């Protein structure tokens, strides 16, 4: 019988963050958490950033040091988006030890994003 390798175990993943799981998933995480608040149904910069996260960032070695998640501001993340002070999308916030430590608004190239995350979590 041929064994199938589950490639998702070898790289990071992009977790869905909702109003219901935000506290346990993000604030109580033992690793820093990079959370992108976006509106994928209508926001082109959000779609662009989501593709970069999904295709490049979570496969980068940085994903071993941090968790990545995305919040749908128009759906399951309305309350946490408001509580986080999100005023525009995409907004990415880095949380460490339950606290917001850095914030970036807009979409950026993958290397700029990685450099920003690395500098924030040291």
Question: Where would I find each of the regions flagged by the language model?
Answer:
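The canonical Cys-X-X-Cys-His
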Residues: 43-46, 92
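Chalcogenol-based redox active-site neighborhoods
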Residues: 2-12, 47-51, 70-71, 83-84, ...
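Non-catalytic, surface beta->alpha helical segment in thiol-disulfide oxidoreductase systems
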Residues: 88-122
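N-terminal leader/targeting and pre-domain segments
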Residues: 1-33, 110-122
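Structural alpha/beta surface segment adjacent to cysteine/selenocysteine redox centers
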Residues: 79-89
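Nucleotide phosphate-binding site architecture
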Residues: 23, 44, 74, 101
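Short pre-active-site segment immediately N-terminal to redox-active cysteine/selenocysteine motifs
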Residues: 30, 38-42, 88
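Thiol-based oxidoreductase modules, predominantly thioredoxin-like and allied folds used
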Residues: 15-18, 37-39, 50, 54-78
